[in-house]
A protein has these predicted regions:
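Sec-dependent signal peptide recognition
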Residues: 1-8
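Hydrophobic h-region of N-terminal signal peptides that target proteins for export
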Residues: 8-16
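Acidic, glycine/proline-rich Ca2+-coordinating loop motifs
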Residues: 15-296
Length: 296
């Protein structure tokens, strides 16, 4: 028994000594990234007055200048959004101001880096959340000008939503060659402000409900109702996942809802719409979902 103990101890020490470090932490001085999404309480704005106070901000990674190096965009809640240009060698430069992306008195939640207009350059779509108010309350679309600057054009593209947006997923749901948008919105009402009754999820809400926006020659039209997407204000959406669930080569949609509402699974009907069928696919579902992923 003593010999066995010595052998096991030797093996443990050998494994410990040969274990390689997989990651190395870089300081802000090394990387140039000093973003800090600092939150401050006020009597008017705190976790009790705003249920998503601690939900955080999104991060987008993409190559904005096609130099082969991924750049980083950070969403700020009570601080400005930040865009960092990858200079190579894990060195980044803050180009937020010169890029025209400084933000003030807005609550940014999610970000998507995607080529909206098909010009080969990544654009930036920022979802706004937090307490409604202010003249910059709507979501913002920053079109890449090709010179490390961006122009806000959400109105021109029909993407200036003013709900409590959490995130946006861009994908070609109708396979017509352009990107459409599933906009994930959080409810504008308090959690305790509902009386759950039958078919309440079938009652659309213009601000609190999710939206499916179809890209029609560069303008995003709201087709939520006609394609079978729930747009009620009982869905506290925190995650949207796109994938081909039934392997028919058509994109399907999974929506993760926080609090009491169940999740949604939309199967693409191959005719321009969706069927919500989660109860046929999943027998048991958790409450308070905050995200999902597809994998084999």
């Amino acid at each position: 028994m003593r010999s066995l103990t010595v052998i096991l101890l030797s093996l443990t020490l050998a494994c410990t000594q040969t274990q390689e470090l997989r990651f190395t932490r870089l300081t802000e001085n090394q990387s140039g990234i000093d973003f800090n999404n600092k939150l401050s309480y006020t009597e008017q704005l705190n976790p009790y007055t705003y249920k998503n106070f601690y939900n955080g901000g999104g991060v987008g990674i993409g190559d904005i200048n096609n130099d082969g190096r991924p750049d980083i965009f950070f969403c700020g809640n009570q601080v400005s959004n930040k865009l960092y240009l990858n200079k190579g060698g894990m060195k980044f430069e803050d180009i937020t101001e010169q890029a025209g992306l400084m933000s003030q008195n807005v609550w940014s939640a999610g970000v998507s880096m995607v080529d909206i207009n098909g010009d080969g350059l990544l654009d930036i779509y920022v979802c706004k959340s937090g307490p409604p108010g202010g003249n910059k309350r709507h979501n913002e679309l920053f079109i890449n000008n090709g010179d490390l600057t961006f122009s806000e054009q959400s109105v021109q593209f029909g993407l200036d939503n003013e709900g409590l947006s959490s995130h946006a997923a861009f994908f070609d749901y109708d396979l017509d060659g352009d990107l459409d948008c599933y906009l994930l919105n959080n409810s504008i009402k308090s959690v305790g402000g509902y009386d759950i009754i039958k078919n309440q999820r079938n009652r659309p809400d213009s601000l609190g409900g999710n939206k499916l926006l179809r890209n029609d020659e560069g303008y995003f039209n709201d087709v939520t109702q006609e394609v079978g997407i729930y747009a009620s204000d009982i869905g506290f959406g925190l995650g949207v996942t796109i994938g081909d669930i039934n392997q028919d080569k058509r994109p399907d949609i999974y929506v993760s809802n926080d609090f009491f509402e169940r999740d949604y699974l939309y199967i693409n009907d191959q005719q321009g719409g969706f069927n919500e069928v989660i109860e046929a696919y999943i027998q048991e579902m958790s409450k308070g979902s905050m995200g999902a992923d597809f994998a084999d």
